[in-house]
Amino acid sequence: MLKPATRGCLATAFLVAAACASTAQAASQAAAMVTPCTATQAGVCRETLTLARDAKLAYYRTYSLSAPNTQVTKAVLVIHGTDRNALAAFTQVLNAAKATSNVANTIILAPRFPIKEDTPPPGFLYWDRKDGIDHGWKQGDDAISANPMSAFTVADRILRLLNLATRFPNLQQVTVVGHSGGGQYTQRYALGGKQPPLMRAGVTVRYVAANPGSYTYLNGFRPDLADPTYQTWQVPVTSCPYNRYKYGLEAVNDYLDDTPPATLVAQYPTRRVTYLLGELDTSRAGTFDSSCQADLQGLHRLERGSAFAAFMDRYHLQHRHQRVVVPGVAHAAGLMFNSPQGRAAIFPASGGGQLRLAG
C-alpha cells in the first residue's frame, strides 16, 4: 500500500503532466492558427523564395509558403504588370479578398519578376528587357541570370508547393490572375503550364487574364476587323511574322517547346480561363503593343480580348472559357480586380467551369 506522501507525489506528478499536456495542446492549436500579413507598406509582407540554386525571387504574401497552414482553402497567384510592382498587385488582390471575406482562408502570393536593369542581388532570377515593354518574363522565357529558369517554371514551382498536402491540406482552389503584362503571362501560362494538371484531386486551378495586350493564338487565323461581330476569320496576307510566339505557336520558347503543339491546342480549351476586359480599355497610349503582330489581333485591348474570345467560340466549340466585360473601367488593375465582375472571377463560388458548347 502506498504511503500518503507517495500518493501525494504521484498525484502532483499527474497534475503537472496533465497541465503540461494541456499547455502543449493549447500551444499546438495556437501555432495552427496563423494571422495573415495584410500590411501594404513596402517590405512588410515580403519574403524571399528560393526555388533552386541561384533561383531566388522576392514575393509578397499573406501567409508564408514555407509553413504548414490548415486555414488555407484558396490561393491566388497574382502577376504584376510591366512596371513589376508586386506590392501594388498584392494590395489590389488583398482589397478584393477583404471585400469578399476571403482574407483568413486565402494565401495571396505576388512574386516579382525583375529585369537586368533592376540590378537584383546575387542569386536572384532576372529576365531580359527586350524592346523596352516586351519583357521576357511575360511570355515564360528563360531568365538570363545564372540560373536560366523559365518564368513559367516559377509558377509551376509555386503551385507544387501549394499542392503539398502536408503544408496546405485543405486547399481547394487556385486562381492565377494578372492585369496587362500580368494578363499576358496568365493567358500563356494557362496555355502551357505543366503543374496545373498535376494538382492533387480536389484542387481546381483557374486563370483570370485581365486586359492583356496580346494573346497567343492556336492557329493562323485572325479576325477580319471590318466585321464587328468577329464572325469573319482569315489568314492574313502579310510579311509580318504574326504567328510567331508570343502571338502564335510558331517558334515557341524552350518551356513551351517541351509540349507538342497538338497537346497545347487540345489542353487549352479545357482550362478554366476568364478574359476580364475593361469596357473603356480602348486607348493605344502608354505601353500599348502597336506591333503588326498585335494589331492583327485588334486595334485596342478590348477589341483584342473580344476577338480572342470569339476565336475560342469559332474554333473550339467546347471550352471552359468566358469573356467578362467590366463596365466603365479602362486600363486600371485596381478597378478591374475590385469590380463585382473582378471579385467574382478571382474568388468564384464553388462549381462552374464545365465544358460548354460555344454558340
Give, region by region, the residue ranges found by the protein language model.
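The feature captures the conserved acid-bearing segment of alpha/beta-hydrolase catalytic domains
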Residues: 201-314
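C-terminal catalytic histidine-bearing segment of alpha/beta-hydrolase fold enzymes
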Residues: 276, 289-290, 309-359
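Gly/Ala-rich beta-loop-alpha elbow adjacent to hydrolase catalytic centers
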Residues: 178, 182
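Structural cue for short, hydrophobic secondary-structure segments
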Residues: 76-81, 110, 275
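Active-site glycine-rich loops that stabilize anionic/oxyanionic intermediates
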Residues: 80-84, 213
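A domain-start/cap signature at the N-terminus of enzymes
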Residues: 26-75, 83-107, 132, 136-147, ...
